[in-house]
Amino acid sequence: MYTSTFIFAKKEFDDEFHALDQAIAAAAKAIPGYRGEETWENSASGLVSNVYYWDTLEALHVLMKDPSHLLAKAGHAKWLDGYRVVIAEVQREYGVQGLGLTAAP
């Protein structure tokens, strides 16, 4: 299993941002190999973290090539005050499988 973690500092979100965000989420959920996602927000720092879980790197690469994702990436400076992406391979998972995930298998 792999994760793609998108950590960002928010600016103002407009209708275009929300439409792209919904389109990216729908595209991710339609990709074979998508396992789920979770979102965390730190109110003290203002940072948000979206974690997507994937069966394979190939599934993640499909999302990276999605037109909505490419549009959001090109326009990120309008909505974000900086971001960082972390791609990781999960070696082990313990506890309640799927706890905290939306759209868990």
Predicted features along the sequence, with ranges:
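Short S/T/G/P-rich N-terminal loop/turn motif that feeds into the first structured element of a domain
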Residues: 1-48, 57-65, 78-105
